[in-house]
Amino acid sequence: MGDAGGHSHHHQHGFQPQLLSFGGVGHHHHLHQFTAQPQPPAASHTRGRGGGGEIVPATTTPRSRGGGGGGGGEIVAVQGGHIVRSTGRKDRHSKVCTARGPRDRRVRLSAHTAIQFYDVQDRLGYDRPSKAVDWLIKNAKDAIDKLDVLPAWQPTAGGAGAGNAAAPPSSSTHPDSAENSDDQAQAITVAHTAFDFAGGGSGGTSFLPPSLDSDAIADTIKSFFPMGGTAGGEASSSTTAAQSSAMGFQSYTPDLLSRTGSQSQELRLSLQSLPDPMFHHQQHRHGGGGGGGNGTTQQALFSGAANYSFGGGAMWATEQQAQNQRMLPWNVPDPGGGGGAAYLFNVSQQAAHMQAAAAALGGHQSQFFFQRGPLQSSNQPSERGWPETVEADNQMSHHQGGLSPSVSAAIGFAAPGIGFSGFRLPARIQGDEEHNGGGGGNGDKPPPPSSVSSASHH
């Protein structure tokens, strides 16, 4: 069993580093066999035949290390030393305990040395290589005795020695197994991270390795989806990032998600809602001569908790045609007494006759800009109740713009001194712009209440 042909030596050599790597020293000594090849035959011969009492001390010292190198193998005492019987599946061959750690009983020789060795074996007439090695060691005994003797292991008793030899493998194997388990646990942790934001807030931090900074994740999400409010600046943990974003899509309505199947073709801008539920537009106060030139200005705020999505895909045009939406002129009462003109709008790509009229805002012309790209409001319920407010506030308006009951675009506002260029959306506006002077003026009337109420039901 200790002898094998040259082919088997070469075949099993590939598995040897895997077993020897557990001990930490076996791999190094395996390389040592290539540099000093005459020594391994002597070691294997000594273990195999159990002779040569002077060689035994050289094999006894590192038994504790040899057990660890065996990868949990069984240590068996033999004449002249000990062998480690491997229990692994990759390397089924036993190893011998040496002063430099466990070594394979099979020795691989260089081509030139193998030719000479088999020539000696054939000339001696031996059928096994180990017999030829025994003959070589016996004839070289005088030269071997002149070599330095390696540190010897002194066993206290035969049974105790075997027990001590059997004990170290478990003690030396545990650190390796613990280290391997740590590596596996780390690999599992990285595998479970797979950017698991879908967990909401349940155990999100336990799966994040130190390399993934939760703040960096939150900043990255906010750069693509500027949520503002709670999502901006307060995301200090992965759970907060997971709750404030599910990649930022929970803020959109389900019908919007169904329309936006192709994410790469659309640009979504999520605008955080502001406290004021109305959309104000800065304007001049309409009043008498003492009203002043600039008048009272109001902030331009986006309505409600709506996140507006801007997209330019043609897919939206076909899917939004089923919605009937209206554009209504609406005047917001000015706290200072004047009426402020603003527009409540909802957008669709409904292809029909597109008409609208421009309204004058405080003696300045309102500019309307249109381009490709719909503006979809995701806050539909809040706008359905607004026509009643529009009807009540129309009495306070000095100037209004009458618009067609059915339009397919939203209007962008521009007034001198505001610098707000407006939203650029597809539409056609037909009509004349009117200029109003001083304190009074005429304006087109808004759509009748019947059309207003019907718009709220779509």
UniProtKB/Swiss-Prot annotation:
Can you cite an annotated GO cellular component? nucleus
Question: What Pfam families is this protein classified in?
Answer: TCP
Limits of the TCP domain: 89-147
Q: Which InterPro entries match?
A: TF_TCP_subgr (IPR017887), Transcription_factor_TCP (IPR005333)
Q: Where on the tree of life does the source sit, at the highest rank?
A: Eukaryota
Q: Where is this region: Disordered?
A: 1-103, 159-182, 278-299, 424-458
Compositionally biased tracts (Gly residues): 65-74
Q: Which GO terms describe its molecular function?
A: DNA-binding transcription factor activity; sequence-specific DNA binding
The alphabetical list of record keywords is: Activator, Developmental protein, DNA-binding, Nucleus, Transcription, Transcription regulation
Cell compartments where the protein resides: Nucleus
Subunit organization: Forms homodimers and heterodimers.
Q: What does this protein do?
A: Transcription activator. Binds the promoter core sequence 5'-GGNCC-3'.
- What is this protein identified as? Transcription factor PCF5
Organism annotation:
Oryza sativa subsp. japonica
Q: Which gene encodes it?
A: PCF5
